[in-house]
Amino acid sequence: MPVSKKKEEQGKTLIGERSLAMCENGKKCIGVDVGGTSVKLGLFETDGTLRFKWEVPTRKEEGGRYILEDVAASIREVLAEREIHLADILGAGLGIPGPVLPDGYVEVCVNLGWRDLNPQKELSALLDGIPVKSGNDANVAALGEMWRGGGMGFTDIVMVTLGTGVGGGIIIDEKIIAGKHGLGGEIGHIHVRDEEWEHCNCGGVGCVEQIASATGIAREARRRMAAEETPSALRQYGDDVTAKDVLDAAKAGDELALSVVETVGRYLGLTLATIAMTVDPQMFVIGGGVSKAGQFLIDIIDKYYQHYTPISENKGIIGLAKLGNDAGIYGAARLVLG
């Protein structure tokens, strides 16, 4: 399978004490982030330096049967171009957009068409038996942010991704907490309010994803515009209003937009407080497209987070993710190091 894009990039070179003990001189590891449109791959030194990254298309026809074959072929091609042998690869990590059981088994991955598959065993077999580890993509991205991103320097973080939906990942003692059924970190489906009209794709009602995702923010703005007569710059967009429109207007002081963002911040603050009282992370890392609103959004979330956690003076801080779309490949590579 031909490589569609290549890019050289130097990464950060610091590494935690635990990982240092696991490094092997001269060895490299590979991070693979499988998405519905493309598969992102990265070649890393074991100290976290990203040497090379590339992408291949995700071929989902015939139940996604070609995806791992394409990944293996592209890895072999890139290694051959750089005169690196598979024997020099410590292992590969695999981020998958769906629940992954502790043994790497995937019962179903709707986005890829996979059913009853163990992709880490399949990929290992395609790469001459090199070790392969796998995890849910959101959890893996959280691991990446802990290793070389917004959570670098901490061992216990929770990542919350605000995009089309709300995703998340929990890292405690540098390990992913995925749970027995692979559902750990499904932060978007934490119940935060009872609104009968607010049905989530999961089948539940009142999930934080329905409020704090990009689609949820736009929906809330449309609902407010229909229910209220408050003048607002958002009205020019009508039903085409986006989360970015709402956040930009809120930054400019638009009253209706600010009320929407306050609602978003309140329920995200409540969600983070619930998580803090459960796992007590050192840091919450906020990523995804909505997080591009920056410190403006973080400050609103933090206001409510502080309100809902009055019993604790020492609590996890809230900050922004730093790795963007590369978080998945960083985290997948970090899986290899244990």
At which residue positions do the language-model features occur?
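ATP-binding/phosphotransfer module of carbohydrate and carboxylate kinases, centering on a glycine-rich
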Residues: 2-7, 11-91, 100-103, 121-132, ...
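Short beta-strand segments
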Residues: 33, 91-97, 159-165, 169-171
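A charged helix-plus-loop insertion that forms the helical arch/lid used to bind
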Residues: 105-115
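Short, acidic/small-residue loops that bind anionic groups at enzyme active sites
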Residues: 116-122, 188, 192
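Short loop/edge segments at beta-strand edges and connector loops
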Residues: 134-136
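Adenylate-forming
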Residues: 141-147, 168-170, 189-190
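A short alpha->loop->secondary-structure connector
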Residues: 180
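Structural signature of FAD isoalloxazine-binding scaffolds in flavoprotein oxidoreductases
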Residues: 183-187
